[in-house]
């Protein structure tokens, strides 16, 4: 289901009554409090789950699903993703965007010379990294920081960046 976006990752179980520990993959973990249904997905398996109860913790979320009533059933959910339809994401302010929206955008330098296309965005402790497939069939990892990323234009489908000398040059 291509129209789904991950908002959580099931890390393990909690207690014996079917609760699971979830790592939030969203900047809005409180969204779990108002979400009634998610889709659980792992590899090629996917099915809907109805949220019964949620407890927000410091870095994790505890979730109880109506369909899961014991630890044995909860164990089957471990290492799966909790997803929602993209049309249910939290609406952002103007000039804000989600990282998944950057995938597929064309990357230009300040002179509008095409550099490549964003393949994906890697989450990194220091800063996120744009993975760009360049026009020279190379991969460029570009930190997603203001020093390099000068403009993101979702409506027109591009990102304007300023690279340091040598970032695109081939090594001899």
UniProtKB/Swiss-Prot annotation:
The keyword rRNA processing applies. One of its GO terms (molecular function) is ribosome binding. Keywords: Chaperone, Cytoplasm, Ribosome biogenesis, rRNA processing. Pfam families: PRC_RimM, RimM. Binds ribosomal protein uS19. InterPro entries: PRC_barrel-like_sf, PRC_RimM, RimM, RimM_N, RimM_N_sf, Transl_B-barrel_sf. It comes from Carboxydothermus hydrogenoformans (strain ATCC BAA-161 / DSM 6008 / Z-2901). It is found in: Cytoplasm. Its main location: cytoplasm. Residues 94-167 form the PRC barrel domain. GO terms for biological process: ribosomal small subunit biogenesis; rRNA processing. The gene is rimM. It comes from the Bacteria. Belongs to the RimM family. Transmembrane segments: none annotated. The PRC barrel domain binds ribosomal protein uS19. This is Ribosome maturation factor RimM. One of its GO terms (cellular component) is ribosome. NCBIfam families: 16S_RimM. The keyword Hydrolase does not apply. An accessory protein needed during the final step in the assembly of 30S ribosomal subunit, possibly for assembly of the head region. Essential for efficient processing of 16S rRNA. May be needed both before and after RbfA during the maturation of 16S rRNA. It has affinity for free ribosomal 30S subunits but not for 70S ribosomes.
């Amino acid at each position: 289901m291509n129209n789904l976006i991950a908002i959580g990752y099931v890390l393990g179980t909690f207690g014996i009554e079917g609760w699971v520990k979830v790592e939030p993959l969203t900047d809005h973990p409180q969204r779990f409090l108002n979400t009634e249904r998610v889709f659980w997905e792992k590899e090629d398996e996917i099915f809907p789950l109805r949220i019964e109860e949620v407890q927000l913790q410091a870095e994790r979320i505890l979730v109880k699903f109506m369909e899961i009533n014991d630890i044995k059933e909860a164990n089957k959910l471990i290492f799966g993703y909790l997803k929602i339809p993209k049309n249910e994401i939290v609406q952002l302010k103007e000039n804000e965007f989600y990282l998944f929206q950057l995938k597929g955008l064309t990357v230009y330098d300040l002179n509008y010379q095409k550099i490549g296309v964003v393949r994906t965005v890697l989450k990194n402790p220091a800063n996120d990294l744009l993975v760009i497939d360049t026009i020279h069939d190379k991969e460029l990892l570009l930190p997603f920081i203001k020093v390099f990323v000068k403009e993101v234009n979702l409506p027109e489908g591009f990102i304007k960046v300023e690279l340091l000398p040598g970032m695109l040059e081939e090594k001899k």
